[in-house]
Amino acid sequence: MAKKKDTPGDGEFPGFSDTLQRTPKLEKPHYAGHRDRLKQRFRDAPDALADYELLELLLFRAIRRADTKPIAKALLNRFGSIAEVLTAPENLIAEIPGAGPTVALELKLVEAIAKRSARSTVMEREVLGSWDKVINYCTAAMAFETREQFRILFLDKKNKLIADEVQQTGTVDHTPVYPREVVKRALELSATAIILVHNHPSGDPTPSRADIDMTKQLVNAAKALNITVHDHVIIGKHGHASLRSLRLI
């Protein structure tokens, strides 16, 4: 008669089989179900999600195995809004506990895509008839910059946007502008008209005396070479000012 072969739990490892049977299955982390539910809520009604929930969703790709809600809330507490989170300096984003360089890179990628998307709505198009799109683009590109930027939109004879360039970047409250350089660049691009744009990091788009004086100098320099300055727009965090609309040029 063949001898029964011992198995673990039949003498050599008493109770081993029972232990295996009693070992509970590993449960999913608490955030796993939350992620699925949040994704479904986004599919059903994206506008119903709070800002921190949208950030949570965005962080899922960068943070695979952790709860992203505390990080999303920490980002908003630190920077103030989704727009300010996306435009915050990469090194400051990385300092948020749980974020690090991977999250910082992910957020800067989204910022770059958003800016390029807005830019595509105005490039090589007649901009004077699409003024809202121009303002939306400039707001996306400049409203939350921490330093002043002086941007020039160069137009051809049909008022189509042929180039968009940041000519100068200054401090928190000043950007040096050189009319001769602006006109020179317009001639190089064969532009017949330009729109001047700069931001106020303070958030208030009200033109200063220096803004008005500089604009008049630029208008005169451009006029001498048959280049039209259509407007000078100042971008704030929650609005803009048009020197043309204010009858300051």
From Swiss-Prot:
GO biological process, one term: proteolysis
Keyword Phosphoprotein: no
InterPro entries in the record: MPN, RadC_JAB, RuvA_2-like, UPF0758, UPF0758_CS
Database matches in CDD domains: MPN_DUF2466
Example GO molecular function: metallopeptidase activity
Motif window: JAMM motif: 198-211
Biased composition, class Basic and acidic residues, residue ranges: 24-34
UniProt keyword annotations, A-Z: Hydrolase, Metal-binding, Metalloprotease, Protease, Zinc
Residues annotated as domain MPN: 127-249
Family in the record: Belongs to the UPF0758 family.
Protein name, as recorded: UPF0758 protein BMEA_A1330
Organism of provenance: Brucella melitensis biotype 2 (strain ATCC 23457)
Higher taxonomy: Bacteria, Pseudomonadati, Pseudomonadota, Alphaproteobacteria, Hyphomicrobiales
